[in-house]
Every structure is written in structure tokens, then in C-alpha cells.
């Protein structure tokens, strides 16, 4: 247990982040990050109940000062940037607060969280950063003027960062899922056709578990059968 590498997962309290943290808990010491301490504590108990180890950080990743303070000194061999928020509505119905929330959590937080742990990875000459993006980062849709824009930004950030740090021993991957049956899709009446959070966690783990000489930079995960109607 003492020799386990450490993985930091943001947005870990539910959905994809929770599924990824549970999977990483089998092989890594996991630091789970989210705003909801009760949900994080439940997750930590689940990880520990099967022999894993876990620390909890209650944190709003949109709070720049809090991110720097909370992650100061945190050793991360793996970082999964998963935190995200979405208000899917036409631009004329979108409030300024909703716009800024998506930009701050979906994109700006990537910079602040990554910037907090990347120096340690570079110093050690190894590390892996995984961004959980979206197929919205490669497309557009009605009601996605801001959400899709933030996911396009995730792609540009990830691809540029990969080129900056690959010669320093640090891998950068981005996993772009399609529709996932989580609380994010609660407005859908039928979610049976969607991916599950575990499906996305499988893709994240595939990227992480590749040999050191192999980089899987981009994975797109879609439901095998599209939505009907």
C-alpha cells in the first residue's frame, strides 16, 4: 500500500469522477476532490472497504485561491481533470452567471489544477494528466453555445499541453465521451441507450494503464447504438 502511486481526481463525488476514482482505488492511493464532502466521504469509505486508500479534499475548483492552497504539496502521479458543469440552453436564455460557471469549471479550472500538480510531475520526470472532455469538443449543437465552446477549449488545451510536456516524461490524454447516463442527463426520459459512467472509466483506465513508452492521447467513446427518434 505504501508503494502505491497517487492519483488526484476532480469532480469525484458522483458520475464519471466517482467511477474513475473507484477504479483507480484498486491500484493507486486516490485523492478525491469535489464540493460535496458528504459524497466524498461516502466514496472514500467505498474505496477503503475494498482495501484501497483515499484522502478527501472539499474544494470548488473554480476558486483559484482555494485550488492553490488545497493542492499545495500534493504529490500526483496521475491527475484526472473531470469536474464539469453544463447549462444546455439557447444563448438568449443563458444567464451571465451560467456562462461564467461553465467557463470557470470546465476550462479555467483545468489551468489552475494542472498548474498546481504539473511542476512535481516534471521534476520527477513522469506523470499522466487525463482530461475528461466531450464529443461536444468536436461538434456543435443547439443549446451548446457555451458548453461546446468550453469543450473545444479543453481539446486545444490538451493538445498543446501534450506537445509541451511529452519530452519531460509527462503524458497528456483526453477522453471524449458521448451521452452518459448520469445526473447530467437527468432530463432525458430514456437513458438506456447511453454510455454508463463505468464505460467512460474504462476508457480513462485504458489511457492510464498503457506502457510507459505508449501515449494514448485522444479517445472518443460513443454509445454503440444511437438514440432513436
Each predicted region: which residue ranges?
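The beta1-alpha1 cofactor-binding region of Rossmann-like NAD(H)/NADP(H)-dependent oxidoreductases
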Residues: 58-69, 96
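Residue(s) in the substrate-gating loop at a strand-loop-helix junction
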Residues: 134
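Active-site helix of classical SDR
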Residues: 114, 150
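Conserved glycine-rich Rossmann-like NAD(P)H-binding loop of the short-chain dehydrogenase/reductase
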Residues: 27-43
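Substrate-binding pocket helix/loop in short-chain dehydrogenase/reductase
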Residues: 90-91, 98-100
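Conserved glycine-rich cofactor-binding loop
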Residues: 13-14
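C-terminal helical subdomain
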Residues: 167-170, 174-175, 182, 189-229
Amino acid at each position: 500500500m505504501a508503494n502505491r502511486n497517487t492519483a488526484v481526481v476532480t469532480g469525484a463525488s458522483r458520475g464519471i469522477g466517482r467511477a474513475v476514482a473507484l477504479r483507480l482505488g484498486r491500484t493507486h492511493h486516490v485523492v478525491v476532490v469535489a464540493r460535496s464532502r458528504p459524497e466524498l466521504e461516502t466514496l472514500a469509505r467505498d474505496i477503503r472497504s475494498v482495501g484501497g486508500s483515499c484522502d478527501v479534499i472539499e474544494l470548488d475548483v473554480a476558486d483559484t485561491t482555494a485550488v492553490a492552497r488545497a493542492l499545495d504539496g500534493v504529490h500526483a502521479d496521475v491527475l484526472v481533470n473531470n469536474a464539469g458543469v453544463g447549462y444546455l440552453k439557447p444563448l438568449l436564455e443563458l444567464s451571465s452567471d451560467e456562462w461564467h460557471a461553465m467557463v470557470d469549471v470546465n476550462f479555467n479550472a483545468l489551468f489552475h489544477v494542472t498548474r498546481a500538480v504539473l511542476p512535481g510531475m516534471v521534476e520527477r520526470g513522469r506523470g499522466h494528466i487525463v482530461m475528461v472532455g466531450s464529443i461536444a469538443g468536436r461538434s456543435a449543437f443547439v443549446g451548446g453555445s457555451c458548453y461546446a465552446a468550453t469543450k473545444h477549449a479543453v481539446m486545444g488545451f490538451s493538445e498543446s499541453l501534450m506537445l509541451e510536456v511529452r519530452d519531460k516524461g509527462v503524458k497528456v490524454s483526453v477522453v471524449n465521451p458521448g451521452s452518459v447516463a448520469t445526473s447530467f442527463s437527468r432530463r432525458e426520459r430514456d437513458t438506456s441507450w447511453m454510455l454508463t459512467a463505468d464505460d467512460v472509466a474504462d476508457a480513462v483506465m485504458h489511457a492510464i494503464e498503457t506502457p510507459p513508452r505508449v501515449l494514448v492521447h485522444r479517445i472518443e467513446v460513443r454509445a454503440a447504438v444511437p438514440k432513436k427518434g
